[in-house]
């Protein structure tokens, strides 16, 4: 535990974005765009927050929506996340009172390597700038995330073909947003008119390359968040991953040193990540699986391996 540099921060971003399949495809891709736009806008207006921390906050800004929606009304949650690419409609359907913003803040706060102010900004990422009663740097960061959210939502509504009309719609969505600070709005419009940056900001690549490495303790908190998102996808696996992690910890406590035991617990939290590729129709099927369904189910083990990270020593 005294060895602080074991797991690359890049691994968390890669694992999080690997969830962008099936029901989580749109929300994770949206989160990735918000992460990149938030970082770019925060840099543009000269905010003091570290760019990597801004990126992570943007990446996690809607995790509270997944948690709230899945717990409160699972059937509506699955139907909406699977069939409605317009995430703004999902928010209006499942969270009219914007409670998910505070939940996202709480989730980010429990990840030890995310800056407290960046996590706090998530509380206000749907709040008009003039209504935020907090530190100005927090308010401006929240407004950058709000602008990034607005841009991404407009893009995803028209994402089949990126055309002149799509770009106009994105610019207009920013111009019409009365909740944006003038400086943030100007930076957002300028960004949309700069084709050099726009391609990278809208693609499906992470564009995240950090030199930071995390201890087992730090990464375990992030692995718990990933495990929560995995388990929330199906009521049949709601406590499965955490149960496996707890039992793994108990079994390894007497057999391994502390660091190796923690690595095993992290592996337990991530052991079913490949199951994201398995359709719910197969996961929830009553009775025996047919031959094809069995093959599909078994492929998730290979997907697990592709999604895991390399440990640096």
Predicted regions and their residues:
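Histidine- and acidic-residue-rich, metal-dependent catalytic cores
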Residues: 2-313
């Amino acid at each position: 535990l005294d060895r602080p540099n074991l797991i690359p921060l890049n691994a968390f971003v890669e694992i999080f974005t690997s969830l962008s399949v099936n029901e989580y495809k749109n929300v994770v891709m949206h989160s990735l765009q918000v992460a990149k736009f938030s970082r770019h806008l925060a840099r543009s207006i000269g905010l003091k927050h570290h760019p990597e921390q801004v990126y992570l906050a943007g990446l996690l800004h809607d995790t509270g929506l997944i948690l709230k929606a899945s717990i409160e009304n699972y059937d509506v949650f699955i139907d909406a996340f699977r069939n409605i690419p317009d995430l703004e409609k999902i928010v209006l359907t499942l969270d009219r009172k914007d409670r998910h913003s505070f939940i996202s803040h709480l989730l980010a706060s429990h990840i030890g390597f995310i800056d407290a102010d960046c996590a706090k900004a998530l509380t206000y990422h749907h709040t008009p700038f003039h209504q935020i009663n907090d530190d100005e740097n927090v308010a401006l960061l929240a407004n950058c995330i709000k602008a990034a959210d607005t841009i991404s939502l407009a893009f995803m509504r028209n994402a089949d073909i990126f055309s002149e009309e799509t770009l106009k719609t994105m610019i207009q969505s920013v111009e019409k947003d009365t909740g944006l600070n003038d400086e943030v709005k100007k930076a957002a419009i300028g960004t949309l008119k700069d084709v050099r940056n726009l391609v990278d900001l809208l693609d499906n690549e992470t564009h995240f390359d950090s030199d930071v490495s995390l201890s087992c303790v730090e990464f375990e908190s992030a692995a718990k968040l990933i495990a929560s998102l995995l388990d929330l996808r199906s009521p049949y696996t709601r406590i499965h991953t955490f149960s496996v992690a707890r039992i793994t910890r108990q079994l390894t406590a007497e057999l391994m040193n502390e660091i190796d035991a923690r690595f095993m617990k992290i592996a337990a939290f991530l052991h079913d990540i490949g199951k994201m590729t398995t359709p719910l129709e197969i996961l929830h099927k009553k009775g025996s699986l047919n031959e094809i369904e069995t093959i599909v189910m078994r492929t998730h083990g290979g997907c697990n391996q592709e999604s895991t990270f390399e440990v640096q020593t």
